[in-house]
Amino acid sequence: MASTRLEHMFEVTIEAGLEPGAGTRTVLDRAREARRAELAAAAELLVVAAEWADLHPVPRNGQPAGWGEVDLHGEGLVPLAGEGTPQVAEFAPVELAAHLGISHDAGRQLIGDALELRHRLPRLFDLALAGTVPAWRARQAAALTTRLTPGA
């Protein structure tokens, strides 16, 4: 089988194609290791998003980041995360999203989920960082709790 080189998005070169003598065990071990790395990277991304938010608090008289637009009809911004979480400067999610190559909405959601987990669901945040709960599942829970009151 011919080898295909994938090196556009990654700092490392990934060789596609079986090495001579590679069996099912080798392929399964590589798959398991790739999945472990993927889960660890997703958890690390939550930490990075929360740290990015810490570095970009809302300046005095500044506009916080949120969902929606302020317009003539009085619609306001919905915060990125639930009550009690820190507000983030307006353009912080946009800058992070650009660096990650994701949409602005995905950047807002990532930061919102990270803040929701760290401030309102700290045990779940710790479980995600430990790898006990996949980050994607923790983020689903965070998205469901954002509008709940702290006592709920």
Where are these regions (language model features)?
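Peripheral, non-cofactor segments flanking catalytic/redox cores
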Residues: 1-152
